[in-house]
Amino acid sequence: MPIQVLPPQLANQIAAGEVVERPASVVKELVENSLDAGATRIDIDIERGGAKLIRIRDNGCGIKKDELALALARHATSKIASLDDLEAIISLGFRGEALASISSVSRLTLTSRTAEQQEAWQAYAEGRDMDVTVKPAAHPVGTTLEVLDLFYNTPARRKFLRTEKTEFNHIDEIIRRIALARFDVTINLSHNGKIVRQYRAVPEGGQKERRLGAICGTAFLEQALAIEWQHGDLTLRGWVADPNHTTPALAEIQYCYVNGRMMRDRLINHAIRQACEDKLGADQQPAFVLYLEIDPHQVDVNVHPAKHEVRFHQSRLVHDFIYQGVLSVLQQQLETPLPLDDEPQPAPRAIPENRVAAGRNHFAEPAVREPVAPRYTPAPASGSRPAAPWPNAQPGYQKQQGEVYRQLLQTPAPMQKPKAPEPQEPALAANSQSFGRVLTIVHSDCALLERDGNISLLALPVAERWLRQAQLTPGEAPVCAQPLLIPLRLKVSGEEKSALEKAQSALAELGIDFQSDAQHVTIRAVPLPLRQQNLQILIPELIGYLAKQSVFEPGNIAQWIARNLMSEHAQWSMAQAITLLADVERLCPQLVKTPPGGLLQSVDLHPAIKALKDE
């Protein structure tokens, strides 16, 4: 058989094999087109599980008459126009294959009208060459797509359709997922003339939990823990069910969205599972509805024809970000609720001291009996989030640090307790082990401090470097190694390989685990402070540093790594500065007594005061 160009209909039917798997696939593609058109109301009519009829009606922007024929052509789209658009996709559709593929395996009719047109127009394709016919029609502003007799001309595909009930259940699940992605859109679903689902739009700032409960059920809503987590261009929002109360029915609720696009991503599922693993049994699964917002340039959605999968350019960063966000919410859930007056109070637990940088040490003062006020939880501030806790040699430090930081942001009203004995020393005696109180942030990377009436400036990047060095320096036990989701494989020279082998024991104490072969080294684990770094740059530089050394001391290597790590904060906030100083005072108390050069600089206000008095 000679090589020849396939007829348009046959080519579209081949493409339909990838895009149109079943009626639910058609519904997904058409509803996503409606959302891209800016629709705020979408009505979906299904007959016989979608095999007989699929009708999607929306109130979007519509399609111009001159573009109707192109809309049914293959590789025709208004979503992208250049490679730059493809590398930063913000729409749900972009391939321009859906309508052409669907029309090749069904009888598709497209009716649309724009606000500028006086009348609507209808288009349909037929014949071997998929010629498009356009004629006038009556229709309001928006678009209606009718798909009749799906797979009528491909009997083999039609045989694989399941029962009417099964196919409609798949459609219902797709609509549930879309309704969770777009709370601002009204969606109505009917089957065989009966309305089955009605999801009303939720106004901006409205009660999204109402739609969440309607879709996921009250059982999930009762156990749902809200997530609001942000770091740079990454934002994680949504809900995760309390793992301690997860049931097999709840475990079926696993909805994840990346930039509003529903996904089935193993990396995201792994991060969530890892965060919940201490609270889930071997046969249990977490339940969640999560929304990940990321810079479109950092994610590739052009992976699968049905757009079910994505690839992240910095997969380790995304994995750890999601893991830490879910873990922080679960740790907050472990906090003991405020007891009522008539309830027996549990024995006090050991809580690290509230550091002076956040204000006066109220925990060192006697409690005053006052009426119990309702607990107030401040709304999460946009553009900032609690700093991710670092581990250290002290067991359970992550939880303690998270608890202290949350207490700095939200202090419950004093409890009614018997009057405590007077403290043996002044309440602010902790000043001797503190840098002081953070007043404000100066030039985005310096903290203005006040201690005993004296003012000083502290360089936050320098303090961060000392903290990292302390975190990386092994104590009585080696630094805990964190396995990489995707090991890093690098090509090395003979000299570099020899240096790595000599430094292997020292690197192991720092939590860096690797395996070498003839010409390559594979980094399998790193300490937690390195997980947020660009290892493809840092590790080769570290190998180059080791190749120039003759003695390999863990302390020297930790110092070099700390000096070469990139700062997590381009601009520091008050909360981040307070958390950093709390960590430095805990792990590096010697810096408070004898600050090294470049860390702390006193500010002399006497000239300014004198100038004011002389005026």
Curated annotation (Swiss-Prot):
GO molecular function annotation: ATP binding; ATP hydrolysis activity; ATP-dependent DNA damage sensor activity; mismatched DNA binding
Pfam families according to UniProt: DNA_mis_repair, HATPase_c_3, MutL_C
Region (Disordered) residue spans: 369-397
SUPFAM superfamilies: ATPase domain of HSP90 chaperone/DNA topoisomerase II/histidine kinase, DNA mismatch repair protein MutL, Ribosomal protein S5 domain 2-like
GO BP term (any one): mismatch repair
Low complexity: bias regions: 378-391
PROSITE patterns: DNA_MISMATCH_REPAIR_1
A single GO cellular-component term on record: mismatch repair complex
Keywords in alphabetical order: DNA damage, DNA repair
Keyword DNA repair: yes
Gene3D superfamilies: 3.30.230.10, Histidine kinase-like ATPase, C-terminal domain, MutL, C-terminal domain, dimerisation subdomain, MutL, C-terminal domain, regulatory subdomain
Domain of life: Bacteria
Keyword Transport included in the entry's annotation: no
Record family assignment: Belongs to the DNA mismatch repair MutL/HexB family.
Role description: This protein is involved in the repair of mismatches in DNA. It is required for dam-dependent methyl-directed DNA mismatch repair. May act as a 'molecular matchmaker', a protein that promotes the formation of a stable complex between two or more DNA-binding proteins in an ATP-dependent manner without itself being part of a final effector complex.
Record's protein name: DNA mismatch repair protein MutL
Organism whose genome encodes this protein: Escherichia coli (strain SMS-3-5 / SECEC)
